Structures are given as C-alpha cells and as structure tokens.
C-alpha cells in the first residue's frame, strides 16, 4: 500500500513540473512581446534579475533560427535587434529660457522597423512558441495602440509649445544696462497688471463706517439728543422747546424798570395746568417811602397787564439781554423810585440823587419788597453763564 501511494505521489510531482514548465514558457513569450512593443524606450539601462533569464532565452531562440536558415539556401540571414537606442536631439537653449517636455521623433521609425522585422521572421517551432495563438493577435494589435499613444503625445507636445509661445509673446524682454546706454531716451512701459486698491470707505460686516469729515461728526454730536422723542421726567415738553425761566424773569424785571412796565411772574401755558396758573397770578409792586397800595388795585393792574400779554410769547434772550444789561448799569447811578397813585392806577417814575432802591426779587409765593439800599452792585458783561445769575439772585435775597 505504501509503495502504491509513493508511486502516485511521484506521478503528481511530474505533472506539476510539466505545468510549471508550460507556465514559464507562456510568461516568457508574453514578456518578449511586451518588450518589443514599447512605445517610448528607456534612455538608460534598467536591468533586473528576470531580464537576464529573458536574454538567455532570446539567445537560444536566435541560435535555433540560424540552424533552420542554414538548411535552406534561398532564405537570407536575419538579425533581430531588441534594443532601441534613441538618438540625442539638439535643444536650442539660446532662444528658449524654459525647457518644455519633448518626445523623440525617431520612435515611429524604430517601431516601423521592429514591426517589419517581426513580420519577416519565420515561424518558430512548437517547442519555442507553444500552442498559444492569442499571442500573435496581441502582437498584431500592439502597433495600433502604439500609434495612438504617439498621436496623443504629439498633441500634448503641440499644446504645450503653443501655450509657451503665447506667453512669450505677451511678456516683453527686460531692458539690459547696454540697451539703456544705447537708447538713453527710450520710453519704459510697465506691463505688469495694475493692483486693485480697495477703498477704505466700503461698508463691511466686520468693519464699521469711518467718517473723515470732522464737521459732520461735530454736528452729529451736537444734535444727538436734540430731537429725542421721549419727554423729560418732570416736564411735558421736549428738550428743544425748553425755556429758561430765570433768564425770562430777569429780562422782565429789567424791561419793567426801563420801560415803565409792571412785573408779573408767569410760566408758559404748556408747562403748567390752568389750576396752578390761577393760583400763581400774583403781582409784584414797588413801594417807595411810606406809600401803601391796596390789594384791589394790585389785582386790577395785574389783570390789565396779563390781558395785554400773551402766554405763548417767547423772548430771544441771546439778542436782547445784552443790550438791556448795558442800559440797566447806566440807570444804577441814579435812584429809581416807582410810585403808584390810588386814583389813576398808573406807574410814575421819579429820579433822585439819593441811594438806589432795592431790586425786587422773584419767587413763586407773594413777596413784599421794601425800599432798602443796595449792598452789592455787579456789572454784567457776559450773560451766557447761568450760575452767576443764580448766585446773584440768592445773594440779593439774603441781603434783603
């Protein structure tokens, strides 16, 4: 039993060796066909271990072909060349600064020679070729594929050359130092593309708008809170309609002294309701010496002045107040005394060389003013600051 098993194993080993030998032959033939049909040959020797085996098999095949040719006299000797060495091509470096990719032109001629030699070869015996007919079909189809690859390479080369020429036409050659010496008056033109300058006034999502006009910014800051829609806390008017009551009272006092007008405290109609307005409609009067005035006459004179005066009149203090102060300072040199007769109910002005009488003060409640000499006399040159006027009124109240 063991002998039979060993015999079967020996038979299997022999069959495996035969199959391996056939596979090596097939691989060898395929590698030979691929080697002869290379489109672009290598410009250097690239030898490996499997190429040495191919070279030995190729030499054996050539020796067999020579023996067959010696038997027949009519057949001529053939030499098979497996290596395609390309011819070196001259490149014009002076004209072109760049070095584009060039494909050798003698590849097509070498391919045609190799295909002609393969066609003229006699048929190899069955031992060298084997029973593979597909290899012959591959060898016939390979030149067509090579032609297609050559056409593609030519089209790529022509496209690269045309692109390089167009770029070379657009870009001008730079001037050398010698050219400038020959033509010193030559005009130099800048061909480089102009840089786009981004404007700083563009509005972006990240950057805010930048205002370069200082006057515009100043007016914007001055008129920022001028037209606000929210009224004040304690008033029913808007900020741009607000009036200064202290300046208004002082102006009325000066006008009454200079122009024989009665003095009355009032506020605009918008800022006070009618109930409070009736309560505060109390007149002020001057007393000179020991003369006394009845309350009824005071009410009559106050009503007459209030009827003649409108509640909505607003005075432009910036224009009139400066002229009034100058006149008032001139009248301070003399004593101004107002007297009121009980019969006519009119004011009369008298001048005397004595001491000046006191100026009446303003308040919301009825005030009794007595004739007392001035302790403090001030010259008003500038009327714009309000703090001086407030301090002046407080000092006059304390003095009285």
UniProtKB/Swiss-Prot annotation:
Q: What is this protein called?
A: Uncharacterized protein C1orf141
Q: Where is the composition biased (Basic and acidic residues)?
A: 112-126
Can you name the source organism? Homo sapiens (Human)
| Residue ranges of the region described as Disordered | 112-151
Q: Which Pfam families match?
A: DUF4545
InterPro entries according to UniProt: DUF4545
